[in-house]
Amino acid sequence: EPRAEDGHAHDYVNEAADASGHPRYQEGQLCENCAFWGEAVQDGWGRCTHPDFDEVLVKAEGWCSVYAPAS
């Protein structure tokens, strides 16, 4: 499965620290603790359930601007 590149959608970055200048980013927000995180697949990459990411894997340490805290 292809892996998301920086800028794939919604200001996505593979390393959340790279989003530090984004107005929506808050420290500690990661794909792996987002409500859209689906499941880990391999080597720190996993599925995102947001429709704009359904064709690619995202990095657990990544971030995008539709981040929503998991409950």
From Swiss-Prot:
This is High-potential iron-sulfur protein isozyme 1. Pfam families: HIPIP. One of its GO terms (molecular function) is electron transfer activity. The gene is hip1. [4Fe-4S] cluster binds at C31, C34, C48, C64. It comes from Halorhodospira halophila (Ectothiorhodospira halophila). Residues 1-13 have a biased composition (Basic and acidic residues). One of its GO terms (biological process) is aerobic electron transport chain. SUPFAM superfamilies: HIPIP (high potential iron protein). Belongs to the high-potential iron-sulfur protein (HiPIP) family. Keywords: 4Fe-4S, Electron transport, Iron, Iron-sulfur, Metal-binding, Transport. In E.halophila, two HiPIP isozymes are found.
